[in-house]
Amino acid sequence: MKYRISFFVLFCFSLPLLSEEKPVYLAAMAKKDITGPSVGVMFWGYAREDQTGLGIHTRQFARSLVVRDISSKKLLAYVTAEVGGIPFEIQRDVVKRLQTELDPTFNYGNVLINASHTHSGPAGHFHYSEVSFYSKEFYSDSYAVLRDGIYESIKEAYLKMKPAELTVGKTIVNEAGVNRSLSAYLANPETERKSYSDNIDREMLQLTVSVSGVPIGFVNWYGVHPTNITFDNRLISSDNKGIASLLAEAEAKKQGLNEYVAIFAQANEGDVSPNLNLNNTGPGKDIYDSSFIIGKRQFIASQQILKSEGKRLSVGLVYTQRFIDMSKHPVSSEFSGTGKAETTCPSAYGYSFAAGSTEEGGGHWLFHEGMTNKNRRFYIDWIAKFMLQSPSDELRECQNPKAVLFPMGETKPIPSLPQILPYGLAMLGELAILVLPHEVTTMSSRRLKNEVRSVLKDKTTEIVLSGLTNDFSGYITTPEEYSTQNYEGGHTLHGPQSLNALRQEFHKMSVELKDGAPATPQTIRPLDLSDRIHPLKIPFADVVSNKPQSVIQPSSESYKKGEVVSCRVAAANPNVGYSKVPSYLWVEKLENASWKPVRSDADYDTKFFYQKRGIWARAEESLDLVWETSQETKPGEYRLVHEGLYLGSDGKKSNYRIECPSFRITEPGI
């Protein structure tokens, strides 16, 4: 009976994907670890120098889909990396290596690297770092781990492509996001707002990939910030998007699909918060519980799509790409909304950027959302001039009504932020994918999609927006939203014409794809700052210590299902083993007189915290190993294990392993 049930579940899992039609694509998916250094590195996202790592909640992964159109031989690689943002340099280096080592047809237009936008991952991988508010350090080792992990995930998928069927499905996701900038949204025309049922985009779109009728994974687009885990957190975490992926992959594994890859990509999350209470708190008892709840809601929605009948994508893979100098891009009167030609502006942060999003915990106390040129303060301008430089009058006028705080695009000899940015449009059958390096608000996304739809018409039935892709460059708001200068407007770097410039360019790219016209010749490229960066070593990677051996605070002898298990052990700094240790924490279960791993530090129900007490020779380094059991945990005998590397006085790094005393998990009431 057990095997009949298992077969029935697997059959239902793959039922929507069964088809007798001949596949028109080759495809495969893959996943690689890209976890950053877990101790002492500032996290990327909240721009708080005091938020540095002290351990791991979940690991970071790069998940890839590679597709080849069998008839045209064209390729498309789509990756979501669980980091806050992807710099263009990563795409540049990955594309170069793909071209030289794998396939020369890879290029900037068909390698799409999306950031999940977790705010709980280490920074240090951006070349524009000298005056960055997200991190002023550049770590070549962690940059290499991110770059190589993305490359290896694409390579693995490319090498195992098989005839595949691609289907698209949709559903509505409830209680997973809320508009955090409602006053800005309400500034949009009432007639436009009435065209939509909600102030956020609750639609989830999923591209499912199946081989021989069995799903091997999917790419899922739904826009919501991974900010359930707030700036109080000190543990690396992929937040709600990563948890959704882990839940989907675990569910597939139950059906015997051990290589299943679930990509929860980032979309139009610009003004969408998962903190449903709009006060930096979510629906759970703490930040980790809230992250799990919002992640699970996305996972459940994705399962609903899997169980429904999807629409099979027909043959046809095309794409186009261009670099745009957003510091001075002309916007024609047809798109400007002012009746005359306009331009975008050199990038600038506004006062309200420094205010942060109030609903996500806010920023500096000197600022508040809604500050415009009318709210400028002479002492703030003086401090900003001392920290960077004063903006020109031309920049203030171009960015109006933004109260310019830092004129990032006017610094010399080079701008302090990238001005030349990558954009693209890809079509996979009837699915159109807009590619942007920005966080795009709900209404901005709708206008961009409508622009593409107005050109492509019946050539596309589904359109998704892939934000935070191939670079990072702040937000895109509508001109009306920009005028309110909430956080998102203050972080719309290139001024009030930014969205209109992109509407214009996506219109042109849509025409190129519709007519089969050649892409616009590339005359500009992003700056190469390779010779200007000053790489640093990963902190604490060379700390000498004796071999850790002791259990400092053992686990209890017994726990009920649902209780939290912990054990404190002596440890070397985890950064000594950075990128070499597959897991610093294992949960092992005794089965048939043999210990077998059942959990690692990649799982959402484990954590480890690094601590250092004392100074100099009397300092004690330790890890707190934590496992949150659940009602689904099977009774039995378990133990927590720590593995790592230590650097001896002889200069050699060696492995060590510490096993905590075993304990029993029992049913409640026993």
Regions found by a protein language model. Give the residues of each.
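Bacterial N-terminal signal peptides that target proteins for export
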Residues: M1-S6
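N-terminal signal peptide c-region/cleavage motif recognized by signal peptidases
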Residues: S14-P16
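Non-catalytic substrate/cofactor recognition surfaces at enzyme active-site rims
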Residues: E20-I670
